[in-house]
Amino acid sequence: MPLTLGQSLFANFLGNSPRWYKFAILSFLAINPILFYLNPFIAGWVLVIQFIFTLAMALKCYPLQPGGLLAIEAVIIGMTSPTQVLHEIQANLEVLLLLVFMVAGIYFMKQLLLYAFTKMLTKVRSKIVVSMLFCIASAFLSAFLDALTVIAVIITVAVGFYSIYHKVASGKDFSSDHDHTSEAPEQLNESELESFRGFLRNLLMHAGVGTALGGVCTMVGEPQNLIIAAQANWQFGEFAIRMSPVTVPVFFAGILTCFIVEKFKWFGYGAKLPEAVHKILSEYDAYEDARRTPKDKVKLIVQALVGVWLIVGLAFHLASVGLIGLSVIILNTAFNGITDEHALGKAFEEALPFTALLAVFFAVVGVIIDQQLFAPVIQWALSYEGNVQLVIFYIANGLLSMVSDNVFVGTVYINEVKAALLNGQITRDQFDLLAVAINTGTNLPSVATPNGQAAFLFLLTSALAPLIRLSYGRMVMMALPYTIVLSIVGILAIESGFLTDMTQYFYDSHLINHHTAAEAAGKALGGH
């Protein structure tokens, strides 16, 4: 029997999503205006929870559509305004440029990265050592590149490995065209494929946590670090030194956690690379080496030189992150002969849906600001003093960063603390310590969920996640040991007085200097 127009509309709404999910989104859209009329504050928090729900269900339906509908309705009923949404996007333009250009730029360095990581994987047989290498390499790269860039690299590498194996296991040779997303059980060894998926999940999670370990250390590591450094008037070196009493112990604790979960096969870790898969990857490596022409070698050299420019440009902040990304695209494509528009377009496919999703997120951020959802938490935290205040800010930041975007959380908190400094509620030295607590609080506990770490959300919504069966719940479970260890070590470094003692030592050694409140007043309250 043919469908009625109404049934057809419902069938088309959110496509292949489950019926219960469609009903849930429709009920949210029906309830929100009523709630907003009754109590705007509660309606604001309900909207945030609903948006988090759409992110949690990312594998049922890409969050752009349901989240976007909720955001559009929020603007229509007056929870926020189009002006506020535009202001949020303008304030975070660097983050959007980063997604559009930097992720695409890395696409053109894929051959070099695949070469480096393939060597790492085929030459090192110990799973524990490979895991630690991936974690440390991600941390190092994240100190200079944005975490999203690093995760984009690792995703590229993993998709490369997966497609090579899938191609050979499906009975084709290395040079054949092949759709690695197809499921062909008659040719693929299911248990072997499952082990390989587990292995890739492990490596991606270690790498994802590595990006958080490295990203917290420097002012270019994460977008919110740049905002915090600007408000505190810190340069690259001073930022790294001030963070080190928390970031150095946390880094070593993170690497130790990587070793322990692999050694004891806890939380879904410890999946071994099947021998047959290792053989295929090794053969592919030898095959690639044998057929590498002088032109191919020059391409690798160009990509390596562009990689050096990328790290130098970011470390010394020679231009905004997105513009450096654009220069990476231009240099790589110009010198490696990629001039076809279609070939250029493929580089932008991975990041643009996520860029649109982030723009929708800024609409929700607009609601949080207009409805002052965070105000009670901030006033409560400022009512304490000394180390207790630092710990509370760290925990409050951490909890909110687990469920909200950490760029937003960091920006809101640093601006509130800046206002407290200018009002004379806290001293300049306490402000500097609070800036450390805010930066570490937004970066470390936020590994708990994909909502907190943009890199994790990017991984979850990538084309790779369904291939290796990486769901939201599995991601949270695998991140759990890291969440616990990083959060606790961070708290101990602050609560024990180690942060304040080391900061005093840095002052005494003239590694850093005291700043003044007047200096802070000179820097207008920016961001939000």
UniProtKB/Swiss-Prot annotation:
GO terms for cellular component: plasma membrane. The lineage of its organism: Bacteria, Pseudomonadati, Pseudomonadota, Gammaproteobacteria, Alteromonadales. Na(+)/H(+) antiporter that extrudes sodium in exchange for external protons. This is Na(+)/H(+) antiporter NhaB. The chain crosses the membrane at residues 23-45, 66-86, 95-115, 130-164, 203-223, 241-261, 310-330, 349-369, 390-410, 448-468, 475-495. Keywords: Antiport, Cell inner membrane, Cell membrane, Ion transport, Membrane, Sodium, Sodium transport, Transmembrane, Transmembrane helix, Transport. Its main location: membrane. GO terms for molecular function: sodium:proton antiporter activity. It comes from the Bacteria. It catalyses: 2 Na(+)(in) + 3 H(+)(out) = 2 Na(+)(out) + 3 H(+)(in). It is found in: Cell inner membrane. It comes from Shewanella amazonensis (strain ATCC BAA-1098 / SB2B). InterPro entries: Na+/H+_antiporter_NhaB (IPR004671).
